[in-house]
């Protein structure tokens, strides 16, 4: 698990959701009838939250006010297992709060409560001391600058210098027009408008994009210069040449927090030794997930994998499957297995399982799970291909891949009407049976097994 230190401006995102179908008699403004409220972690905390969703360990450095919002904010961070030992309280400021009013899933106004003054010398010293203490034990750093007073020029440059001294990857999400503040960072993630304002250069051509990225590299000594281009993806330099990593087409509901998702996923993928191109593809996939949701949303590894693999529409992560089935009234049948080298016996078994109900869900062991259960030489067929083959069967309605050795979490979440296992489970404990209304044992078709097929192939090769 990678350990990442995030430093920056902490923002509490508050949402009022409802319907607006009339104007106020007091003024020509819409009236919102509130149906629900929600609170999200924003700013640098949203970056940290994205990293948690991507299975990283996160230390968060920032400042909240001495108020109720700050107290709630810290509790929300702890609930997400984000280290809060360097969240400082500033008695001279309020916790930054952005309130968004949403009517019929459209944002109609945002109200900001904030103080942008720079931190006092004592708070800056405490942040730098914590950074200095942590820099040796973490893998990478993200500076998330929302221009709310935490990351001034001097503190930013000291942190970049310390990260470079200890050979740590450091990425910055910049604000403002003076990019010398981020000089010598490993990578910065400006969007098109931010970079145009900083360099006073219109990015309306490949030539100007390339020129802008060269300036970041040569003038500001950014090791991996790139620019995010909204629906056009991400552009970066590779051996001096401009490369565009296109975005993944997806319906956009809300771009709130997409930049936080991009820098979090870029950081983690680079720390996992991906190339810059691979990291940009990963970040684009993560962004495609979050813009398809309302609010400062998160992308899970399973959702990103689904986008990257462009898999069959029947192959869903558990969260998405539960959403799909939320209002169903049909009888659900669940079974699971490795299904390595799909054969007639598998197909016959699944057809009989489907006949027991309306919706057949197949839990599929991941490659890592199969390897633990059956040895290093298995699976023969990758989980991506196994899932696709299963989804291609007309009797299978959904396929969900699980990483664990058993499907207990899937069964507990899905609570199927019927749990189907092979007849070889007779007089054996059936994991998850307590969460199903009924358990059925089903005979396999004789003469068919993956192991037998593998042995037959071996004998043929030896002959």
From Swiss-Prot:
Give the catalysed reaction(s), semicolon-separated.
D-glycero-beta-D-manno-heptose 7-phosphate + ATP = D-glycero-beta-D-manno-heptose 1,7-bisphosphate + ADP + H(+); D-glycero-beta-D-manno-heptose 1-phosphate + ATP + H(+) = ADP-D-glycero-beta-D-manno-heptose + diphosphate
Q: Where is this region: Cytidylyltransferase?
A: 334-463
Name the enzyme's class.
transferase
Which keywords fit this entry according to its UniProt record? ATP-binding, Carbohydrate metabolism, Kinase, Multifunctional enzyme, Nucleotide-binding, Nucleotidyltransferase, Transferase
Q: Pathway, per UniProt?
A: Nucleotide-sugar biosynthesis; ADP-L-glycero-beta-D-manno-heptose biosynthesis; ADP-L-glycero-beta-D-manno-heptose from D-glycero-beta-D-manno-heptose 7-phosphate: step 1/4; Nucleotide-sugar biosynthesis; ADP-L-glycero-beta-D-manno-heptose biosynthesis; ADP-L-glycero-beta-D-manno-heptose from D-glycero-beta-D-manno-heptose 7-phosphate: step 3/4
E.C. number(s) listed in UniProt: 2.7.1.167, 2.7.7.70
Q: An example Gene Ontology cellular component term from the record? A: cytosol
Does the keyword Transmembrane belong to this entry?
Answer: no
One GO biological process from the UniProt record? ADP-L-glycero-beta-D-manno-heptose biosynthetic process
The annotated active site, in chain numbering, is 260
Positions bound to ATP = 191-194
Pfam families under this entry?
A: CTP_transf_like, PfkB
Task: Show the segment(s) annotated as Ribokinase.
Answer: 1-311
Q: Recall the GO molecular function terms of this protein's record.
A: ATP binding; heptose 7-phosphate kinase activity; heptose-1-phosphate adenylyltransferase activity; phosphotransferase activity, alcohol group as acceptor
Q: What does this protein do?
A: Catalyzes the ADP transfer from ATP to D-glycero-beta-D-manno-heptose 1-phosphate, yielding ADP-D-glycero-beta-D-manno-heptose.
Query: What family name appears in the similarity comment?
Result: In the N-terminal section; belongs to the carbohydrate kinase PfkB family.
Subunit structure comment from the entry: Homodimer.
Q: What is this protein called in UniProt? A: Bifunctional protein HldE
Q: Which organism is it from?
A: Helicobacter pylori (strain Shi470)
- Taxon lineage: Bacteria, Pseudomonadati, Campylobacterota, Epsilonproteobacteria, Campylobacterales
Which gene carries the instructions for this protein?
hldE
């Amino acid at each position: 698990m990678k350990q990442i230190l995030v430093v920056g401006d902490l923002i509490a995102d508050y949402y009022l959701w409802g319907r607006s179908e009339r104007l106020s008699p007091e003024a020509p403004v819409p009236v919102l009838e509130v149906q629900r409220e929600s609170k999200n972690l924003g700013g640098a905390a949203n970056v940290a939250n994205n990293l948690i969703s991507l299975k990283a360990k996160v230390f968060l450095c920032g400042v909240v006010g001495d108020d109720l919002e700050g107290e709630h904010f810290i509790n929300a961070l702890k609930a997400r297992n984000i280290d809060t030992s360097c969240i400082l309280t500033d008695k001279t400021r309020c916790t930054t709060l952005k309130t968004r009013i949403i009517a019929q899933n459209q944002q109609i106004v945002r109200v900001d409560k904030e103080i942008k003054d720079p931190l006092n010398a004592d708070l800056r010293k405490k942040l730098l001391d914590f950074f200095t203490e942590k820099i040796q034990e973490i893998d990478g750093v993200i500076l998330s600058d929302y221009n709310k007073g935490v990351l001034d020029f001097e503190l930013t440059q000291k942190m970049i210098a310390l990260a470079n001294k200890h050979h740590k990857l450091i990425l910055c999400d910049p604000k403002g027009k003076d990019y010398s503040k981020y000089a010598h960072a490993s990578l910065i993630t400006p969007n098109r408008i931010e970079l145009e304002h900083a360099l006073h250069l219109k990015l309306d051509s490949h030539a100007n994009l390339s020129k802008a990225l060269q300036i970041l590299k040569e003038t500001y000594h950014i090791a991996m210069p790139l620019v995010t281009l909204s629906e056009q993806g991400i552009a970066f330099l590779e051996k001096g040449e401009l490369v565009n990593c296109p975005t993944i087409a997806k319906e956009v509901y809300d771009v709130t927090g997409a930049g936080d998702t991009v820098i979090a996923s870029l950081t983690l993928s680079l720390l996992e030794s991906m190339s810059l191109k691979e990291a940009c593809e990963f970040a684009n996939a993560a962004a495609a997930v979050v813009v398809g949701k309302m609010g400062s949303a998160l992308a899970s590894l399973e959702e990103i994998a689904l986008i990257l693999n462009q898999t069959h529409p029947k192959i869903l992560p558990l969260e998405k499957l539960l959403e799909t089935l939320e209002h169903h009234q049909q009888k659900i049948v669940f079974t699971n297995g490795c299904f390595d080298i799909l054969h007639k016996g598998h197909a016959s078994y699944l057809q009989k399982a489907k006949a027991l109900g309306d919706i057949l869900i197949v839990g599929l062991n991941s490659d890592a799970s199969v390897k633990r259960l059956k040895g290093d030489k298995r699976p023969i067929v990758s989980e991506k291909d196994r899932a696709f083959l299963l989804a291609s069967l007309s009797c299978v309605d959904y396929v969900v891949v699980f990483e664990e050795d058993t499907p207990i979490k899937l069964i507990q979440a899905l609570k199927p009407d019927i749990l189907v296992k092979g007849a070889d489970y007779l007089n054996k404990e059936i994991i998850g049976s307590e969460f199903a209304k009924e358990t059925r044992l089903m005979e396999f078709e004789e003469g068919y097994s993956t192991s037998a097929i593998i042995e037959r192939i071996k004998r043929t090769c030896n002959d």
